[in-house]
Amino acid sequence: FTIDLPAELKGVHMSRLVESMTEEISNQFRVHPSIEELQIKILEGLAQKHPFSRGEIKFEFEFGYTTRTPVSNKRTWEVCNVTAITRKENETPYIHEVEIEVIGNTVCPHCMANNDGLTHIQRAIGKLSVIGETAAVPKYGSMIDVIEKSFSSKTYSLLKLEDEMLVTKQMHENPLLVEDVCRNILQLAKEAFSDRDLEMFAEARSLESIHKHDVIAQGRLVTNGY
């Protein structure tokens, strides 16, 4: 929680912050269509208990989803990191910021082109952040799909040998620099969410396997819903 403190108050009412969040989360008879809607309800509840003109609530959590391995068709659970922030200032609309972080991989095309097809591969981390009003925020699954498609290949928690063989083949058929991954995230996000008013940020981090450093690329774009 972050709120501004009215001038007439000496300090914040700490218990009211916790109380407003606990009441909303503990209400088992209320179903929220999204994390963002839950955060709105918490801030609305807090506004009834504690005066503020600007408030912010932030959740950091792991988001689990299922997929199928590419050859053996085994069901596997994947997990990605999510940061969700909702802000409210005076009478302006609620603004949300959602960041999703997904693990994939990169294959160095420069080394491959100059080394008879031999190259280094490594895990990579892709991030997509979106900022917008409630109706504009995409579903988490669609954001995950954008990031996963931006790597040399998807990665999986569970892989049988036949899956490993295909993933390795796909990686080497699609060598990408970390800058390519970042550009892919932004391009695919633009195509997927062009009908929404969003500010979007992308980051790709390559956990270099033969270097003693990581490589990071970042980018930004804005869609205007038309």
Predicted regions, residues:
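N-terminal intrinsically disordered, cationic/polar leader segments
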Residues: F1-Y226
